[in-house]
Design a protein with these regions (language model features):
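Membrane-interface "cap" regions at the ends of multi-pass membrane proteins
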Residues: 1-29, 58-63, 67-79, 86-87, ...
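Inter-helical loop and helix-membrane interface segments of multi-pass membrane transporters/permeases
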Residues: 2-6, 33-38, 68-91, 104-162, ...
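Membrane-embedded translocation segments of transport machinery
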Residues: 2-8, 12, 167-250
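Extracellular loop-to-transmembrane helix junctions
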Residues: 6, 35-61, 88, 142, ...
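Transmembrane helix-boundary motif of multi-pass solute transporters/channels
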Residues: 10-50, 233-242, 246
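Hydrophobic alpha-helical transmembrane segments of multi-pass membrane proteins
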Residues: 16-22, 48-53, 91-102, 148-153, ...
Length: 250
């Protein structure tokens, strides 16, 4: 890709795009589940260990490769590993595509529940949330509609390239952090008698006996990759659209 063509306007555009790629169901949905199933604070030990010795260095390497090659994952692997390993670039591209399959579905659910929330359908203590969920799933037309709505919105966001993604991400990232901090604020104001404080303490309490369980370390390794999209080709792709004068380590 020639210098001066479609690129991010600045560092913040690239940072927001990278954060958007990293912060997804792997962090917001999967991470709490992994913490709960692997000993709370115990899980944080292998997660942080692999995050800094494997996932973050891998992300930096991906950015360096994409910035140098100025092409997609297939071309990048062909340049750095030879033609025989170009299939690895295709594999990483397929991983991101496969992830998009379920993201479209889950994002469709999210938009549906946003609609239910603003229309007041979820208000009140007598609302049967299980019934609301089942009614939605039993209506294939609605499920498909919201999934295709997500696909259409995504296409609209990426249609004009990196600069369009940069503009959309600015608002999406601000909205994401606002919602996360609002959730944190509300959780701190909850009645601790319902177990909220116990959950917070559990998250930062290490059970040293569990550190000898291989499953905890395996889950920590996999979660570290989910936490920053390491090895999924997204960083290689975004690096193509960064300026050659930009630092690889942001």
């Amino acid at each position: 890709m020639a210098e001066g063509s479609d690129q991010f306007n600045g560092r913040m555009g690239l940072i927001f795009a990278s954060i958007g790629a990293a912060i997804g169901t792997g962090n917001i949905w999967r991470f709490p589940r992994m913490v709960g199933a692997n000993g709370g604070g115990t899980f944080l030990v292998p997660w942080l260990f692999f995050l800094f010795i494997w996932s973050i260095p891998l992300v930096i390497a991906e950015y360096a490769m994409g910035k140098r090659s100025r092409t997609g994952t297939i071309g990048t692997f062909r340049i750095f590993a030879g033609k025989k390993f170009a299939w690895m670039g295709l594999w990483t591209a397929w991983i991101s595509t496969a992830i998009g399959f379920y993201y479209a579905v889950v994002s469709g659910w999210t938009i549906k529940y946003f609609q239910l929330g603003i229309t007041g359908a979820l208000n009140g203590e007598n609302v049967d949330t299980t019934e609301v969920w089942n009614a939605f799933l039993q209506n294939p037309g609605q499920v498909i509609f919201f999934q295709f709505l997500v696909i259409a919105l995504t296409l609209a966001a990426i249609w004009k390239g990196a600069k369009a993604i940069e503009k959309v991400n600015f608002y999406l990232m601000i909205s994401l952090f606002a919602l996360l901090f609002l959730t944190l604020f509300l959780s701190l104001w909850m009645d601790f008698s319902d177990g909220s404080l116990d959950g917070a303490l559990f998250m930062f309490t290490v059970d040293f006996d569990m550190l000898f369980e291989p499953e905890v370390w395996i889950n920590g390794l996999s979660q570290s990759a989910w936490s920053c999209s390491a090895g999924m080709g997204m960083c290689i792709t975004y690096a193509v659209y960064m300026s050659k004068d930009e630092d690889t380590v942001l």
